[in-house]
Amino acid sequence: MKMRNFFLLILLLPIVLFAGGRPPDRPEVRAIWVTRFDYKSPTDVSSIIVNCAQAGFTDIFFQIRGNGTAFYPSRVEPWAFELFGKDVSKTGTNPGWDPLQMAASWAKRYHVRLHAYINVLPGWRGFDSPPRAAGQLWTAHPDWFMVDSTGARMKPTSAWYSFLNPAHPQVRSHLSQIADELARYDIAGLHLDYIRFPYDYTDVAREVYPNASSKEIKAHSVFSFDPVSLGAMGRSASRRKWDAFRRKSVSQVVADLCGIFKARKANAVLSSSVLADFSTGYHEAFQDSRRWVKEGSVDWLVPMNYNARLFDERLGKMKHALGRRATGGKLVVGINCAGDAREIRRQIEVSRRAGCRGFALFAYSHLFENHQPTVKGEEVIRCW
């Protein structure tokens, strides 16, 4: 009898150990974000991939689209000026090399998974307009952008974006073409960021409306009252119906991109950054991330859990919203590396104890300086 109970315990042990989350057959995801500001040359790209691989990261979110411009030869968007510095007039200038192709080649050589990382809805940033000859969205398709409740097109600020309207069918078609282009590269997945409504525009709107009252700032921060959306909803629809419409519009873009990308790469990983607070994401940014997971539009959900004080609480709420099974298979926790190494290591351990699929660190520049590991970077990677 005792022997039978012993063998029963052995059989049940894996279930007990992994009841909290990640199954034993799914290795930990250790991802890192590399932003478009981290590289300007082929040497930068090769150094980044080698550093990340040798540091033990399994996945790299490598940014190749920031605000309606591309860091690869695209048929639908002009080259990004950032490869040349800060001169907006360089928009559309071919740098003579393909950062995404180079990153993909180095990633394959060093056996690390590379994900094309795109800002989905940002269409332009900054006060200077791109040259008209470049055909950038801000000048070529002004009607594709969100419109505030006063009827004004959303204005970018010095460091903030103007967002494309996810309800516009031509916007969805355009973004789908980008996903199709990216699926032709030898990469592991597609990573989505800024796939939401700009719920926080009130924080920056005063830069473009310096003399506006608080009430006027609020009016300039509610989106989108464009002709397409008004045609579908009208102005008399309730807030609840408007919110549902906005949420559905964002979810449709996620589903579109997933469908297009996986039509060419069935085994690819579709991941998305989302707000760390599930309720804020759902009610204010209109991210129905639980639906994305349930319907299979995303394989990994990456909440940007960047507030150290609220880290544990927000992780707990996200885990509760998704459920145990989705947490272990889908939840990759985003961790901000701007703080000290001890706190970063603590958050990694909290994520592990919660049974998450893994974690993603933001960002490369916090762990490497001039492509050399910082003291903080060396301390952080010692925990795996």
PLM region descriptions:
Residues 31-39, 79-96, 158-173, 239-249, ...:
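The substrate-binding groove and active-site-proximal loops of carbohydrate-active enzymes
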Residues 122-126, 200, 264-310, 346, ...:
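Substrate-binding cleft/loops of secretory-pathway carbohydrate-active enzymes
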Residues 72-84, 122-155, 195-233:
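Aromatic- and acidic-residue-enriched segments that line the glycan-binding/catalytic groove
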Residues 57-94:
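Aromatic-lined carbohydrate-binding/catalytic grooves of carbohydrate-active enzymes
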Residues 113-121, 191-199, 236-285, 329-340:
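Aromatic-lined carbohydrate-recognition surfaces of secreted/lumenal glycan-active proteins
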Residues 297-314, 318-321, 327-384:
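Substrate-binding cleft of secreted/luminal carbohydrate-active enzymes
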Residues 25-30, 39, 121-185:
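Active-site-adjacent "subsite" loops/lids of carbohydrate-active enzymes
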